[in-house]
């Protein structure tokens, strides 16, 4: 599910209502991840804004690099720069009865950790072979010890 960035609370609410209607709300892990870092302003590629108002067709407006850093506070810099403000993305996980409410973990994970997490949650094993062809090893580690337990690192 991809959520519209303009109204994420409505889209997530719609999903939660549907899960409740299906009686699966207490049996579903929901993970919400945003994009990394704020836009850092105009780079080497410049697009002419013309005489348009911001938001009109043909307009192109971005915040400058100084405002971008405020959008990434408390982290330094912005998208395209390898400081935390440019590479970090928050992850919010929800699973009633499994994940403690209000807990904040300052550990590090990666998108490659999601597939091992889902396999672990489902009690499934990643196949070593598929249709007679050996598969590559699954990268990443399960995040369940962090999500369900008290661990900060896996």
Regions found by a protein language model. Name each.
Residues 1, 94-99:
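Short glycine/proline-rich turn/loop motifs
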Residues 1-6, 82:
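Short acidic-aromatic active-site loops that bind/stabilize oxyanions
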Residues 5-8, 12-15, 29-35, 90-92, ...:
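Beta-strand elements within well-structured catalytic alpha/beta cores of enzymes
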Residues 14-27, 121-130:
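Surface-exposed helix-capping loop/turn segments at secondary-structure junctions
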Residues 20-94:
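Histidine-centered active-site microenvironments of extracellular/periplasmic hydrolases
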Residues 57-84, 98-107, 112-154:
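C-terminal cap/loop subdomain of S1 sulfatases and analogous C-terminal strand-loop tails that border
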């Amino acid at each position: 599910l991809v959520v519209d960035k303009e109204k994420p609370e409505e889209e997530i609410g719609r999903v939660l209502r549907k899960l409740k209607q299906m009686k699966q709300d207490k049996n579903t892990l929901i993970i919400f991840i945003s994009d990394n870092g704020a836009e850092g302003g105009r780079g080497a590629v410049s697009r002419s804004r013309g005489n348009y108002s911001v938001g009109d067709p043909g307009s192109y407006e971005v915040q400058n690099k100084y405002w971008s850093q405020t959008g990434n506070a408390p982290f330094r810099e912005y998208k395209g720069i390898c400081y935390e403000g440019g590479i970090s993305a928050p992850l919010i996980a929800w699973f009633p009865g499994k994940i403690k409410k209000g807990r904040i973990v300052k550990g590090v994970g990666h998108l490659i950790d999601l597939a091992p997490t889902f396999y672990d949650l489902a009690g499934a094993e990643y196949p070593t072979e598929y249709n007679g062809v050996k598969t590559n090893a699954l990268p990443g580690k399960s995040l369940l010890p962090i999500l369900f337990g008290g661990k900060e690192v896996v």
